[in-house]
Each structure stands twice: as structure tokens, then as C-alpha cells.
Amino acid sequence: MSHQFSPEEQAVLRIVQANLPDSLTPYADLAEQAGMTEAQVLELLGRLKASGAIRRFGASIKHQKTGWTHNAMVAWKVTPDQVDDCGRKAAEHSHISHVYYRPSSAPDWPYEMYTMIHGRSEAECLGVVEDVKRTTSLKEHAILRSLKELKKTSMTYFT
């Protein structure tokens, strides 16, 4: 079900999709930019969250500056009957931020479930891989390491 965003909603989302104002009163500053009151902005954001039109509202932290310097995308060989249970168990791990199921159409690529693992060292990431293997029926996997970050931005939905 899609949500038709009003001009007022779009105005607020256009501002918050970039960055919140760096001040002691970010919502008041945001309201001023949008031509609204702070109460109106808070009500609008609360309504959008409650309706499911926005999933979450929070800070993006530069993980490298907090010591989380390693990550690994792990591709797992999974059967269709394993996906829900194994995906749920993997998602419970605190070092895993994303779990996706993507059916493969490539005959030489048997991996269909992907987890994004974060750690403070390569050994910590590898330990998470072992934890997933121990707590699920998943065994066969491929670890895809990033060689270079080419782009990392948040999506812009309203311009």
C-alpha cells in the first residue's frame, strides 16, 4: 500500500532526508524551514511513523569512528524451506545489520541469502559467521569483502 504524501509532508521530508539541523532545537529549526510550528512537525512525523509511511527516524553514525572498522557481506547457500527460519535467526545477531533473500538465476552461484556483518576486526566478523553456522542449518557460504567504497549515501526521495 503506497502513501500519497501531501505537499506539507513532502516539505518536511525533503528537509529531514538530508540532515537534521545541528542545534539544541532541531525540530523548531526544521519547523521554521518548513514554514510550520514545532508541534505541527512533531505531529506530522509521528503520524507518518504510526501509519508506516516512514519506518524509522534516527541518527546515522559514522561506524568507522566508533571502532566498527570491518564488515563482510556473506552469501549463504539456502533452500527455500530454510529461508524464513535461518533469516530470522541470523537477523537476531547484534552484529548483523541486513539479511536479504535474493533468488539466484546464475547456475554457478548457489547463494541466495545475504547477511551484512559488522565488527571491530576481521576475526570478530569471522566469529559471527561461525555463530550463524552454529545457530542455523546454514553451512555453505562465500564471504564477499569490500575492496573500496565507491558510493554510500542515503536515498533522496523528495527533491
Curated annotation (Swiss-Prot):
The keyword Lyase applies. Keywords: Heme biosynthesis, Lyase. GO terms for biological process: heme biosynthetic process. Its EC number is 4.1.1.111. It comes from the Bacteria. Belongs to the Ahb/Nir family. Involved in siroheme-dependent heme b biosynthesis. Catalyzes the decarboxylation of siroheme into didecarboxysiroheme. Siroheme is decarboxylated to monodecarboxysiroheme, which is in turn decarboxylated to didecarboxysiroheme. This is Siroheme decarboxylase beta subunit.
